[in-house]
């Protein structure tokens, strides 16, 4: 194939030069800076404070429900001991873990002696704590549509009843296997001992990853959840070591509060723990953007309009497919859009009657593409031509039409905007008439109204 000799032909080496890869440590730093920026946008410091208060009110009722469940079935006694040991040794600073677990067990024992009405109140309080956590995670993932109430009730019930049993069984089995392996083998290899010492960290990371997958009302990839889950587990371990060092070297709270020091230390630890969990959730929610190589949501003016046209084209191309339509994940991957961007566009297209969601949670075109104009898309995503200010000032509409249809020419000047000159709309304006007083043959479309 021959090429004309142009300015670019004299430097073939430059054109073929491979793009330099960014060092991995730089990429990791950018990821954490981006996650920190997202954490600031989500106001995680304030959210952690709110969750700390809610946890203090709900942890005793939750623990009472869990302990009553373990007490009702003696076969679960070993599971309970394994769960308590894990909470004390893996999720709390060693300096205060024994005191905190003693207090929590005393409170839970007293609460378990309540009447049926009191027990129902405990269950409701526990569910309120879970609902708060559910709302917080959905806010981090920018979920606008909650699960149906029966589905949420099923998830909450599973978390309250099955969650502690599964966690206790897993921890008991892990500790049992570790003890048996150490008993059968006298000289345990150092690498095996090291692996066993990391089991609590691995279980914590897997637990948080499962939480990030199950709680948000959105499809979360396991690879993203695992990154956030193990990030949370590592941060918790580092915080626990730093917190224990601070309490032993600088016993400020003990000097000031004396025997009462356990309470403020416990509150501070809950707050720091929620910060770690929320930061891990933010990392998991930001992972799709990071994989796309983008470091922010595209908030450029007009970007939703371009995204809406791309979505409509993708849904049009999917007509006739079996199963019908495309899933949100497939659309996001095909169009290189973040789920937040895509969901905002899909919800607006659904309200316009241009797209619809099937029972299989797939998106299809909900209108006749041969007779549907782009007017409602233009009005709702770019410029509402029916707003009163545009009817009162037609020069603005004409100037916008000229800018959209300039096709490489010169944009209108301020004098032309003032009415000294008029431009004829071409290009996109021919598809979507921009004069507010001139609509299609089918009549004007109000914002939010589909022409299907």
Swiss-Prot record:
Keywords: Cell inner membrane, Cell membrane, Membrane, Transmembrane, Transmembrane helix. The chain crosses the membrane at residues 56-76, 114-134, 153-173, 195-215, 225-245, 259-279. It is a multi-pass membrane protein. One of its GO terms (cellular component) is plasma membrane. Coiled coil: none annotated. The keyword Flavoprotein does not apply. It holds the Pfam family Virul_fac_BrkB. Belongs to the UPF0761 family. This is UPF0761 membrane protein Bpet3042. It comes from Bordetella petrii (strain ATCC BAA-461 / DSM 12804 / CCUG 43448).
